[in-house]
Amino acid sequence: MKIKIYQISTEKDKRNLLFMGFEFTQRHGGVDPTEYELVFEGEVEAKHLETVFYIFNTYSEMPAGYRGRSLSVSDVVVNEDGAFFCDSFGFTKLLEEFDVGKEAT
């Protein structure tokens, strides 16, 4: 599966949403792509997001070149099916395109 992983940049996190769940994030203005940075882009041996979560939480499984922290709540995984917010339990599909170059509306 080809994926991109985005994580909230600590320098850009003005609303203190790092590691916060989707509902909390929505109550505080929603997911703003401009607060995120790309930490991985590439292919992984996975068919499901849960496997992606396992790979990026198991040091020995992480691909070479991965420069992020372990995959956690508030991270966004983008694949051919869309953008998915890593929530407290599972993933929540984001309804809008996740574009880090675009301001939130």
What residue ranges belong to the model's regions?
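Broad hydrophobic/π-residue packing in well-ordered secondary structure
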Residues: 1-8, 49, 84, 91
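Short intrinsically disordered terminal tails
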Residues: 1, 101-105
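Short, conserved turn/kink motifs that form compact alpha/beta structural patches or helix kinks used as
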Residues: 29-78
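Short, compact, well-ordered microdomains
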Residues: 67-102
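Short non-domain terminal segments
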Residues: 17-22, 38, 54, 82-83, ...
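Extended boundary segments
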Residues: 1-44
